[in-house]
Regions:
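Histidine/acidic residue-rich metal-binding segments in metalloenzymes
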Residues: 2-10, 16-165
Length: 168
């Protein structure tokens, strides 16, 4: 019982402080333990660790290369599978890739998802060149191919929410 709590947010990939829950058995336990909506920041922690070599200090233009599409997609696929197994409704926060949109559109029984305005407006690498670290966020701004698919999905009402805030 979580009095006064409207939902739970889980970071599957490291993003802000020590809020990480990357083990999918633990994620299934969380899903089974509450009737509240659970929202997920969906990036695969193991992939982030493996790809650390692509991260270059003081070079924001490498951010989207390090945190690539596969890092998000791998986590999103696992979350969809867990939602289907547990029959629990979940929400995946700030989707950034065409591949995620395509898989999520086909799996709406237990899963909703959102996009943020900055992922609809900006694209890599130009956003990083122009804005530097101001363009750096998790998951990252991706190239124009993804922006185009996100915009079309929003137009087609495939996206459940348009979130205005991302703080990490």
């Amino acid at each position: 019982k979580l009095d006064g709590c409207c939902g739970v947010k889980v970071f599957v990939g490291s993003s802000t402080g020590t809020l990480l829950v990357s083990n999918h058995e633990d994620i299934k336990k969380i899903m089974k333990s509450t009737k509240k909506m659970i929202s997920f920041h969906s990036e695969d922690e193991d992939e982030l660790i493996k790809r650390e070599r692509f991260r270059k200090k003081n070079k924001p233009q490498t951010h989207y290369i390090w945190r690539d599409v596969n890092t998000a997609l791998k986590s999103t696929r696992k979350l969809i599978a867990n939602a289907n197994k547990t029959k629990k409704k979940i929400h995946i926060l700030h989707i950034t890739s065409a591949e995620e949109v395509n898989i999520l559109k086909k799996n709406k029984k237990y899963v909703s998802f959102e996009v943020t305005p900055q992922h609809l407006v900006f694209s890599a690498p130009s956003a990083y060149k122009k804005l530097g670290t101001y363009a750096q966020m998790n998951p990252p701004i991706r190239d124009s191919r993804h922006k185009k698919v996100l915009r079309q999905a929003l137009k087609n009402n495939d996206i459940d929410l348009n979130n205005k805030n991302i703080t990490h």
